[in-house]
């Protein structure tokens, strides 16, 4: 390392010693969270060209992430970091930059105008810089939380990673403005759970559900649907694991994939391979909604608990499967063919329990709505104590995975378990949720739900760009608030959701009419969306709607797998009484690290190690 000033020389000397120590203890520090064959088990391409590739591992004991960034073609430097929604403004960054004299690595941040500043608290610590035939490798680490106001708090949910390329040497770091750079974003879950892999049964077999040599369309976004079928007479099996198969060279284009089983009520489903929004798509494909497997960029293999498996095949189960592949092609690359898909691992030796999937949250109904121009409007759905008392077995159920779901305006989703009126634990939470990144996530800890418990699912929405109210429903411009929880043992309870009582919503429309000069159409022939569309969205009408959702009785959907409600009275039910709420977690501030550099690290990246 070449050091241009005494202050930086002193920091670099201390730091050089620390680097040697870190490299010796790195594998030990990560032991238990990485397979023996790789200290960096998680990988994603950051940019469509494959110039930047990120690998990482997690030390939960140290509350630290170790990153390895491969820069295949380095010009004058790169930016990498995180931000709330993937913007380059107000971003937490680490920057490799060059001037006429040398190269530097430093912790930085950007302000609301995209101007980059060196961070006074250097929380990204460089451990190694090495040139190889593949490119430049940068190994560095970062605590989950730093308590630095300019830093991003790394949490369990979605993280929006950002990157940018520097084309020419700089006079100084402060001369960077992100608005003039070639930049991009990638979404990923960084904090993967550290769960031991269960052993697979001796009779495990595999089945590949793959796209049939698809010519990826030359457009930015494509959802491709492909229908295939199980062999005739395929008996009942348990899926015990699945993993992605991504065609080599397409790693940056295949964004996520799902395998759905079709409804058993149809004896046949027409074969189809084409865009999911094609007018040629058979209508029956809309009834292929039962999720067997789901994968998103950055995820690895999904294992079921040793005591449970997901049943498919046999009597009462459809032979037809639908593969859906989301191609993300921002550079509009043409001529690329793809056969990506999902490999299912299954066994004929059925495990003790069938795994089930239950829907929590809000019913798909327009009575739940978000006013326009809202930055953080919250809607909440309930799975009530009355429903769980009636529908769950005496021994309860065990939730081991979860898939959160909203449409385009969703920003946060959380499901909380409450018992005896007190919130006790988080089932799943994503404070940076994106509707463009949905995956089934293993829970770090299995959540046990007992009869009489309450499951509360809340979604936060942003409708700043909308002129009319956004109502609940199936359409992509309508909204949902759902948590698909994966659990065992399977029960008859498939859907446990709520919505405000329609009669109380009608009272809201009458109240709006009484206190506003503009008349809201409440005539019998007017639909709920039409009535919401005629509401003048002043502060009074917004606050009253918010209050209504917070106290009005609810209509409960406590449904069997046959879509029929369990016997009982489910309309005009009181909201569950919650007397104690969980406190928001307080970020842990790591102790001041004497080995952290006081300023940027100076590198020699012409070859060898820095």
UniProtKB/Swiss-Prot annotation:
Catalysed reaction, written as an equation: dopamine + 2 L-ascorbate + O2 = (R)-noradrenaline + 2 monodehydro-L-ascorbate radical + H2O
Residues glycosylated per entry: 177, 559
Keyword Oxidoreductase appears in the UniProt entry: yes
Protein name per UniProt: Dopamine beta-hydroxylase
Annotated TM spans: 10-30
Cofactor(s) essential for the protein: Cu(2+)
First-level EC class: oxidoreductase
Stored SUPFAM superfamilies: PHM/PNGase F
Origin superkingdom: Eukaryota
Role played: Catalyzes the hydroxylation of dopamine to noradrenaline (also known as norepinephrine), and is thus vital for regulation of these neurotransmitters.
Topological relation to the membrane, as annotated: Single-pass type II membrane protein
GO biological process terms, semicolon-separated: behavioral response to ethanol; blood vessel remodeling; dopamine catabolic process; fear response; glucose homeostasis; homoiothermy; leukocyte mediated immunity; leukocyte migration
Pathway, per record: Catecholamine biosynthesis; (R)-noradrenaline biosynthesis; (R)-noradrenaline from dopamine: step 1/1
All ranges on the Intragranular side of the membrane: 31-610
UniProt-listed PROSITE patterns: CU2_MONOOXYGENASE_1 (PS00084), CU2_MONOOXYGENASE_2 (PS00085), DOMON (PS50836)
Subcellular location: Cytoplasmic vesicle, Secretory vesicle membrane; Cytoplasmic vesicle, Secretory vesicle, Chromaffin granule membrane
């Amino acid at each position: 390392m070449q050091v241009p000033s005494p202050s930086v020389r002193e920091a670099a000397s201390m730091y050089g010693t620390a680097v040697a120590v870190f490299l010796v203890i790195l594998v030990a520090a990560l032991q238990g969270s990485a397979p023996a064959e790789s200290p960096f088990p998680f990988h994603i391409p950051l940019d469509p060209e494959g110039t930047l590739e990120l690998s990482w591992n997690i030390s939960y004991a140290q509350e630290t992430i170790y990153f390895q960034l491969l820069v295949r073609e380095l010009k004058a430097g790169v930016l990498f970091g995180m931000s709330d929604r993937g913007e380059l403004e107000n971003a937490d960054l680490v920057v490799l930059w060059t001037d006429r004299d040398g190269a530097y690595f430093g912790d930085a941040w950007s302000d609301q105008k995209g101007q980059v500043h060196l961070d006074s608290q250097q929380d990204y610590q460089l451990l190694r810089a090495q040139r190889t035939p593949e490119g430049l490798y940068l190994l560095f680490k970062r605590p989950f939380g730093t308590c630095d106001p300019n830093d991003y708090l790394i949490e369990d949910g979605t993280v929006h990673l950002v990157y940018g390329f520097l084309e020419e040497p700089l006079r100084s770091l402060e001369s960077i403005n992100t608005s003039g750079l070639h930049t991009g974003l990638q979404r990923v879950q960084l904090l993967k759970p550290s769960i031991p892999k269960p052993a697979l049964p001796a009779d495990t077999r595999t089945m590949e559900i793959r796209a049939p040599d698809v010519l990826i369309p030359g457009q930015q976004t494509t959802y491709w649907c492909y229908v295939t079928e199980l062999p005739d007479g395929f008996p009942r099996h348990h899926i015990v694991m699945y993993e992605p198969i991504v065609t080599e060279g397409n790693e940056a284009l295949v964004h996520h994939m799902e395998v759905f089983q079709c409804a058993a009520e149809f004896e046949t489903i027409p074969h189809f391979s084409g865009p999911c929004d094609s007018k040629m798509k058979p209508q029956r494909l809309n009834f292929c909604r039962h999720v067997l497997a789901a994968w998103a960029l950055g995820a690895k293999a999904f294992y079921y608990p040793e005591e449970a498996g997901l049943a498919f095949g046999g009597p009462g189960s459809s032979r037809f499967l639908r593969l859906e592949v989301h191609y993300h092609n921002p550079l509009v690359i043409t001529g690329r063919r793809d056969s990506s898909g999902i490999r299912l691992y299954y066994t004929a030796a059925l495990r003790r329990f069938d795994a089930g999937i239950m829907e929590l949250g809000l019913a798909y109904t327009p009575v739940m709505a978000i006013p326009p121009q809202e930055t953080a409007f919250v809607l909440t759905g309930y799975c009530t104590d009355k429903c769980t008392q009636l529908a769950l077995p005496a021994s309860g159920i065990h939730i081991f995975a979860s898939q959160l779901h909203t449409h385009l305006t969703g920003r946060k989703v959380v499901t909380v378990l409450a018992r005896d009126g007190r919130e006790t634990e988080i089932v799943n939470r994503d404070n940076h949720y994106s509707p463009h990144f949905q995956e089934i996530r293993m829970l770090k800890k299995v959540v046990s739900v007992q009869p009489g418990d309450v499951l509360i699912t809340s979604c936060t929405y942003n409708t700043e760009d909308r002129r009319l109210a956004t109502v609940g429903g199936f359409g992509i411009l309508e909204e949902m608030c759902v948590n698909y929880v994966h659990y065992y043992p399977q029960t008859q309870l498939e859907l446990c959701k709520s919505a405000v009582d329609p009669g109380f919503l009608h009272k809201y429309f009458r109240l709006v009419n009484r206190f506003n000069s503009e008349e809201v159409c409440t005539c019998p022939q007017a639909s709920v969306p039409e009535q919401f569309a005629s509401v003048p969205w002043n502060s009074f009408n917004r606050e009253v709607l918010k209050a209504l959702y917070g106290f009005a009785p609810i209509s409960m959907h406590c449904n069997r797998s046959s879509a029929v409600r369990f016997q009982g009275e489910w309309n005009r039910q009181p909201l569950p009484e919650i007397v104690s709420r969980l406190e928001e977690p307080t970020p842990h501030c790591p102790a001041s690290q004497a080995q952290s550099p006081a300023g940027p690290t100076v590198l020699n990246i012409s070859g060898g190690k820095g």
